[in-house]
Amino acid sequence: MQQTTDILGAALAHHQAGRLGDAKAGYEQLLAREPAHPDALHFLGLLTCQAGQPDEGIALMRRSIDAYPSAIYHNNLGNALRERGRLDDAIAQYREAVRRQPDYAEAHNNLGDALREARQPDASMQHCAQAIALRPDYAQAYNNLGNALKDLGQTDAAVLAYGKAIEHDPRYADAYNNLGNVLTTQRKFDAAVDSYRAAVALAPQNPITHRNLGAALLARGDRDEAIATLHRLVELAPADAQARVDLGTALRDAGQADAAIAQFERAAQLSPLRADAHAGLAEVLYRRRQTARAAECMTRALELAPDHGPAYRMLGDMYHDLGKYDASVMCYRAATELDANDIDAHHRCAMVLLKQNRADDALHHARAALALNDRAAPAHMTLGDVLGMLGDVDGELAHYRRAVELDVTNPVLHDRLIFALATHPSIDQQETRRAARHFGEYVEADARPFAHIDTSVRASNRRLRIGWVSGDLVTHPVGIFLEGVLAHLDRHRLELIAYPTSAAEDDTTARLKPHFDAWHPLLELPDEQAAQRIRGDGIDVLVDLSGHTAQNRLGVFAWKPAPVQVTWIGFFASTGLRAIDYVLGDRHVLPPGEEAHFVERPWRLPDSYLCFTPPHAALDVGPLPLRENGAMTFGYFGKLGKMNDAVVRVWSRVLAAVPGARLFLKAGELDGERALRRTAERFARNGIDASRLVMEGRSPRTDYLTAYRRVDMMLSPFPYPGGTTTAESLWMGVPVLGMKGERFVTHICESVLQTAGLADWIARDEDDYVAKAVAAAADPERLDALRHALRARLLASPLCDAPRFAKHLEDAFYGMWMDRTNAGADERVAAGDERN
């Protein structure tokens, strides 16, 4: 009969050789003879675990321990339990192993590793150290000691431990990988890359080391090599969604959008429940301006991971770009609820609420953003925007000043400050000029102006190429005033090239485009490239139609891409740029004595600097409301921010002096309940009951114009009146009462009224303003007659004489051309002679 030891020896030999079937037969043969044979039970248990039956294998191993409780059996059972995910039970077996055999180095090492997994790094470190004490060349124990030290934050000691592991086993790939991890934690990316490369060389089929190497290469800026490494990772693990997310992220950041999209899409297919795959795809689609699909993907990501604040913030950005402002606000608020310290979400939420004219709601988020970082210039800017809409012009100005102090490099901050200074009721215009010049000095310092050829060779009668730079070639005051003029410019004298700075287009854009010989958007071009484009187009006169308003490109003008540069119509104060030669106005907005407000030289058109294009809607003037209502209706259609405290006080005096009179206010801000309440409270503080106010929000353009039929007389605010609204009011037969001013912006209403022959509707001061309003209200016959005559009067005035205006504008361009090119003072046109 075969001896027991022979059967066991043969079975073990088969087991070690991988012949598991033969080994199993041998163990079972032995157990048939000796059912409680501890080695047979134990090794059959190990084999059964290897064969994918862990529960049956663990049961056999427990029987072996019952038969013979050796330290080795406890250690091996611990390994089996750990592989099964039963960490606490495994730790108990390792502890029993070292209790039974205190000098059992392998059991101490395994216990240390398991304790680290159980987040007990101190205990882990002790047992790993004990294993090393028992076996000083134990590389695996050094590696596990390094892991414990890393978890304890002792990174320098961890580096030493991994180094010892590698010293004792130079082919220990895991130790190199772990060393790379701790070096990455220390931001020693060069050394980390070296360690990961060693790990990859030793274990070239291990995806983990490729992933870590790719991340370290990205961290130190080796993008191309990182992408190549991550491609190798995907080759090794094509079904690993995380690998594809990592590669997609690297490709996205490298600007390889199509390749990135392919990786994120494949990751989402492999693992549909991976939020980061959907979020990564959303982000790259958003960068490709596929915003609608990007929003769908980000929504899916948030369904899978609803606690991810940054994803809500980005989805808010997407909804904003899609014009879905309510949804955008909801997303930003969700982001701030998840993380009250998300300054970007607070800031962006405030900006969208402002676009919805919800200044009161915006105030909370603007203040929250600033509280999180009072040195964040954009947060100061946004709070300034909110306060301005709420009518707090001093608070608005203070925050704009602070924003510029914090970030002098941001031109938008300068724009806000200069605009606020120009329209503030009590700011000296020399301060506005200084702020504008501060901006000019900054942008001109970064520009290298183009040199232009000797002007003596330029002919005075050649066809001029005129460039028009604007973000407002839409239904906007600029577009409205420009439309009629372009149609009447002499195309034999002028060639027109548009340089839009905004992607926005509408019906007005469609009517404007045919008047241009070329349409060259500047949206994606930095200032220098935009200037080179204009220079390459051979522009003779470059016209700025924005000044310090939204989407301006004053930085382009600093490069002096055209020999003659002029600012017109879009703004009402100095740009601050010496590179802009002229500011175009008229004798009303640029009266003698106010030239010092500008860095640019004033150039005055003979009649008006504005040319009004009547609305295309076929609307009648309508009867005088006073006749039908029996009470006077004053009106103001414009931004509430123009209604400063002095304006509210004066208008309240008018209402108090005209019994039964009402004030019809129409503004986008009045779509909000809080704005309605706040406006009523402002008048109540001046003794005017809310019943005397009619307040309406935004309307479609035709409905907006129709609303003028409900007004007897418009009241223009001061010092920031309306230009477009004044002209529109006159066209609808409604006279406008204006206030004489002392700077360009305050003269705009004056210019319209003077040109329309309504100089007697300009008040000298507040008392005269009230007196004129009261007198007009007391003379319905005059109002009625004026109402039915105003449209014809306006249309017959130079304000609506587009051919006349176009000729003056052409002459101005030629006059500027001759003036700046020194072609001879005797060739200057008469219009230019009016400047001082």
Language-model features: locations:
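A conserved nucleotide-sugar
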Residues: 493-495, 652-681
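Alpha-helical solenoid repeat scaffolds of the TPR/TPR-like class and their adjacent stem/linker regions
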Residues: 1-630, 649, 681-688, 699-713, ...
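Donor-sugar nucleotide-binding helix/loop cap in glycosyltransferases
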Residues: 715, 729
